[in-house]
Amino acid sequence: MSRPARQLARVIGPAAVPGVAALFKILGDPSRLALLDLISHGERAVADLAAEAGLTESATSHQLRILRTARLVRVRRAGRQVFYALDDLHVARLLRDAAAHAGEK
């Protein structure tokens, strides 16, 4: 194991490293981050998310499915519309912390 990987294991525990790495891989996609940012302001319909993110509804649904599988967003259906919201406050904190870290010089 490389030195940075050993240091990470000390913070989150060796058993959690693969899951955390998978989460960061999911968050590494700009389209998914843009969708999470839009959803962080409140529950949103797929069509609205697609329009604001500049994606097709099909591409948006695909990315949202990945985020839902990772338990980052939750879904609510109302008739023919599908709405997404952040799964919990941990997701909002994760996004806020990542943005703060990325903005550090």
Predicted feature descriptions by range:
Residues 30, 41-45:
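Short capping segments at the starts of secondary-structure elements
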Residues 1-27:
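N-terminal leader segment of winged-helix/HTH proteins
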Residues 38, 52:
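Residues within the alpha-helical elements of helix-turn-helix
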Residues 45, 56-59, 87:
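Helix-turn-helix DNA-binding motif, specifically the short coil turn and the N-cap/start of the second
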Residues 68-78, 85:
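Beta-hairpin "wing" of winged helix-turn-helix
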Residues 51, 62, 68-69:
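Alpha-helical residues within the helix-turn-helix
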Residues 16-20, 24, 85-105:
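Conserved segment of winged-helix/HTH DNA-binding domains
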